[in-house]
Design a protein with these regions (language model features):
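The feature captures the beta-strand-to-loop junction immediately N-terminal to the Walker
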Residues: 50-52
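Helix-to-loop junction immediately C-terminal to a conserved catalytic motif
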Residues: 65
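A short, proline-enriched helix->beta-strand linker immediately N-terminal to the Walker B motif
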Residues: 170-174
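Catalytic Walker B motif of ABC-type/P-loop ATPase nucleotide-binding domains
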Residues: 176-180, 185
Length: 278
């Protein structure tokens, strides 16, 4: 059973496998960025992290990845505190796709994807047959096989994002964290990337700004506002006109479309008119 206010299973015997955050808080520059946030993604599903700028989405992803430590609360991986799990072990199970990626080294696409095998190899050891098979599989799953010999510098934004995902897949993770991967992509590339991630059937947590993309592709969403969880649960239950007005301060019309009844959101204007003279 899931409580829509927290998105957490209310069953005391709930499975503790995978990556989860319990009661996580984090401050930065004296400001509370995350305030008692709990997140327990269901295995094999895509969870969207939603919220306005500054709501804590990227910070939560960095805490889940172990890049930042929470000030209170705990992040666990298969029931063990993430801070006690060796970094190489974490890297073999949790992959991260950043919002922006660049390199000063003139890598080919295949070489960039091979970086995903680093957690599986000893220092200075050559690639194994298993490494190369993982790279070939990642290139194929992301539709990059024909671009394997291309230089990173010649790639479009959408192609670079696919390379990042291929690199993450080469890690052979169980959990995939993505920080606003659709930013700066045109509509076709946004849809292609979302369909790719949704079809992976890994446990994915993705920060998103576009509510309609979240409605189309996510299994569950968690809505953050000023560092706190406002709502969490299936997209059909969470993305309501009332929540959009409360969190984003805009009026919206939410309709159910298609055989699956997923929400479609049409924005109508600000939720409140500006004060006279404001």
């Amino acid at each position: 059973m899931t409580d829509i206010s927290t998105g957490v299973s209310t069953d005391a015997s709930a499975d503790v496998t995978g990556l989860r955050a319990d009661g996580v808080s984090r401050t930065a520059g004296g400001a509370l960025v995350l305030d008692d946030v709990t997140l327990a993604p269901r295995p094999g599903t895509l969870t969207g992290l939603l919220g306005p700028n500054g709501s804590g989405k990227s910070t939560l992803l960095r805490v889940l990845a172990g890049v930042l430590a929470p000030d209170s609360g705990v992040v666990t991986l298969d029931g063990d505190r993430l801070s006690t799990v060796p970094r190489r072990t974490v890297a073999r199970q949790v992959a991260v796709v950043e919002q922006h990626a660049d390199t000063q080294v003139d890598l080919t696409v295949a070489d960039a994807v091979r970086l995903g095998r680093v957690p599986h190899r000893r220092a200075w050891s050559p690639s194994t047959a298993a490494d190369e098979e993982a790279v070939r599989s990642a290139l194929a799953r992301t539709g990059l096989t024909d671009l394997a010999a291309r230089s990173w510098r010649t790639l479009s934004g959408g192609e670079r994002q696919r390379v990042q995902i291929a690199r993450a897949l080469a890690q052979e993770p169980r959990e995939l964290l993505l920080d606003e991967p659709t930013n700066h992509l045109d509509i076709q590339h946004q849809l292609d990337l979302m369909a790719l991630v949704a079809g992976l059937r890994l446990t994915c947590v993705m920060a998103l700004h576009d509510l309609n993309l979240a409605a189309m592709f996510c299994d569950h969403v968690v809505v953050l506002h000023e560092g706190r969880t406002m709502a969490a649960g299936p997209v059909e239950e969470v993305l309501t006109e009332r929540l959009i007005a409360d969190v984003y301060r805009v009026r919206a019309s939410v309709t159910r479309e298609g055989p699956d009844g997923r929400p479609h959101i049409r924005f109508l204007g600000p939720a409140q008119a500006p004060a006279p003279g404001g």
